[in-house]
């Protein structure tokens, strides 16, 4: 078995792996790359011989299992929507999810929490590596432009989840609007941000919302005032992002999954003013239980 980490640092790596595959048929090769890579599209010599696996951060379910010693299984979105009340009844006798939910939101997505070292410092180092190595090296961007990408990421982070003003961002980092859009796409490919579009639209059009890829990143960037609603929407989008397409609906706090399922993320403690609609699924935070089309937000962390 040949194990290779960050294979993209080796020049002509894909053709060399192909030679190894052809010359040593009994050799098993395992290599790591980057989410910025377009593995099959940009490396045709590997077509048909490589199986790729996308390694994501921990889901809330995985974090909960690690912290409590339980072995809760994942559920599909359909199972959660149609059977959430029964699912919750199998979980609550064993654990109180809300006791662990804030810890997950703060530091549970990345495995650094398992190490007895400074979590924020490790995360900042990883964020730097994503920009300095993954984006610059793989996209072949000159080092002199690194500060522009980092500044753009910071500006997007402190603005919070909203539609980016591309013209203002271009002025801030002194580059063209087209380059800003490319940088935004690179940051999304590096899993530092999520870009949200209306149904039927995608890059290179301007997104209706840019948000951090996961809630842990929001705590790592300073100074930033973290809003609970923004944290919970970031968690929701990140939880669905693995296997579902998430689009922006026509109102704040509303999202559309897979082009048909309408969601609203809301606080269970502040719902007196909400008119509940049978056509909307309410993902409610600050509660452990749900009913009918009102589902506790934490349960969407059981999607993988």
Per-region residue spans from a language model:
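Loop/turn-to-beta-strand initiation segments
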Residues: 1, 24-30, 260
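Interdomain motor-coupling "hinge/lid" segment immediately C-terminal to the ATP-binding subdomain
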Residues: 34, 40-147
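Accessory nucleic acid-recognition modules appended to NTPase machines
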Residues: 110-250
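A short acidic, amphipathic alpha-helical/loop segment
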Residues: 15-19, 273-276
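Conserved P-loop NTPase "ATPase switch" module shared by AAA+ and STAND
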Residues: 1-13
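Structural recognition of the conserved hydrophobic beta-strand(s) that form the central parallel beta-sheet
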Residues: 3-4, 28-34, 54
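Catalytic cores of nucleic-acid endonucleases
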Residues: 246-251, 266-304
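Conserved catalytic cores of phosphodiester-cleaving nucleases, focusing on short active-site segments
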Residues: 236, 240, 253-269
């Amino acid at each position: 078995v040949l194990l290779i980490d960050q294979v993209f640092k080796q020049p002509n790596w894909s053709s060399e792996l192909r030679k190894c595959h052809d010359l040593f048929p009994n050799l098993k090769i395992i290599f790591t790359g980057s989410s910025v890579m377009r593995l099959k599209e940009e490396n045709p010599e590997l077509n048909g011989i490589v199986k790729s696996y996308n390694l994501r951060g921990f889901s809330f379910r995985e974090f909960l299992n690690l912290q409590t010693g339980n072995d809760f299984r994942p559920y599909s979105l359909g199972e959660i929507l149609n059977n959430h009340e029964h699912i919750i009844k199998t979980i609550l006798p064993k654990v109180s999810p809300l006791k662990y939910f804030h810890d997950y939101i703060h530091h549970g997505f990345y495995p650094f929490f398992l190490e007895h070292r400074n979590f924020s410092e490790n995360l900042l180092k990883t964020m730097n590596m994503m920009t300095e190595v993954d984006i610059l090296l793989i996209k072949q961007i000159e080092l002199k432009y690194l500060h522009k990408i980092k500044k753009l990421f910071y500006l997007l982070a402190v603005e919070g989840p909203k539609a980016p003003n591309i013209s203002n961002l271009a002025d801030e980092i002194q580059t063209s609007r087209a380059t800003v859009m490319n940088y935004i796409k690179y940051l999304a490919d590096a899993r530092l941000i999520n870009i949200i579009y209306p149904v039927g639209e995608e890059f290179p059009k301007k997104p209706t919302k840019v948000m951090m890829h996961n809630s842990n990143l929001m705590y790592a960037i300073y100074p930033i005032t973290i809003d609970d609603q923004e944290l919970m929407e970031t968690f929701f989008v990140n939880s669905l992002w693995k296997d579902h397409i998430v689009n922006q609906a026509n109102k704040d706090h509303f999202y559309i999954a897979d082009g048909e399922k309408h969601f609203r993320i809301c606080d269970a403690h502040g719902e007196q003013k909400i008119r509940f609609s049978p056509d909307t699924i309410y993902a409610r935070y600050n509660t452990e239980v749900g009913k009918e089309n009102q589902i506790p937000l934490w349960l969407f962390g059981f999607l993988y």
